[in-house]
Amino acid sequence: MMASYPEPEDAAGALLAPENGRTVKEPEAPPPSPGKGGGTAPEKPDPAQKPPYSYVALIAMAIRESAEKRLTLSGIYQYIIAKFPFYEKNKKGWQNSIRHNLSLNECFIKVPREGGGERKGNYWTLDPACEDMFEKGNYRRRRRMKRPFRPPPAHFQPGKGLFGSGGAAGGCGVAGAGADGYGYLAPPKYLQSGFLNNSWPLPQPPSPMPYASCQMAAAAAAAAAAAAAAGPGSPGAAAVVKGLAGPAASYGPYSRVQSMALPPGVVNSYNGLGGPPAAPPPPPPHPHPHPHAHHLHAAAAPPPAPPHHGAAAPPPGQLSPSSPATAAPPAPAPTSAPGLQFACARQPELAMMHCSYWDHDSKTGALHSRLDL
């Protein structure tokens, strides 16, 4: 008798078939263990990762979770280190940042200790106006808050000047109207544009006069005074003034002596320029009655004298010795003054005429022929 084995399909079906109508349940995950207080246990921060909170949020968090709602600086440090182990290292850096935020942020108020004593440090608390600066207790999001208006100091109140209601003190000359609405004074204008444009130029000091020019100017002034005292008709005074003017003019064409006013009728012996034209003085007396070529006058000459000593009369086209058209510089009377010799040395024509004057008795014809040229 042979044994029969069941088919594999039937065996698999028998294993999968429920026994007594029961279904097989899959295993479930174990429930989480309850934490303290019946809630879920908070995740511990990673000591190597910096917390995502600003220093203002850390300070506010420490003050709010304190019992008295105020903490000293050391208490804030201890809370941050205990709450976030990341700040156990590099204490110097973040503690300086905590101090700066306490001093510069207006939401933190310093409260002095009661009674003083040996204990140092002040309390820090939150401003009541900044209690809700974080949205719904989220320290990662901070609201934009408007700063409360604080009145300015008394000396900077709007509409008032820096030195009181008058706006001026001690004669400073700044009026109250010159200040703006916030009490700040406009810069004073000490120099106006009109004053700068209408200012007078500074006088320039005159250049010093050379020593030689001073000496000659003094001599010329003394000679002019002597000539004025002697009278305009005196030939000696004119010769003295004219002789003194010669050496001063020799220092340059723009000498100071030439610009000095000379007596009327006196001509400079250097360039023939003098003062305004005036009536010529009467001719001086001569030792002999015949005319000579070196006695020329600027006024109308008398009618020509008849020729003498056998000299022929000049033709009508030639110049006569007494013609007013040839107004040469008048020669001074013969004198022994040194100025006369200097003038003759500077002007060769006058020197020739003076030499011809002294030799006139012997060379009368040669003088007339030389002048006719």
Swiss-Prot record:
UniProt cross-references to PROSITE patterns, sorted A to Z: FORK_HEAD_1, FORK_HEAD_2, FORK_HEAD_3
Biased composition (Basic residues): 287-297
Top-rank lineage group of the source organism: Eukaryota
Pfam family, one: Forkhead
Transmembrane segments: none
Chain intervals for the UniProt region annotation (Disordered): 1-49, 272-339
Annotated GO MF terms: cysteine-type endopeptidase regulator activity involved in apoptotic process; DNA binding; DNA-binding transcription factor activity; DNA-binding transcription factor activity, RNA polymerase II-specific; RNA polymerase II cis-regulatory region sequence-specific DNA binding
Residues within the DNA-binding region(s): 50-144
GO biological process, one term: apoptotic DNA fragmentation
Glycyl lysine isopeptide (Lys-Gly) (interchain with G-Cter in SUMO) crosslink location in chain: K25
UniProt protein name: Forkhead box protein L2
Gene: FOXL2
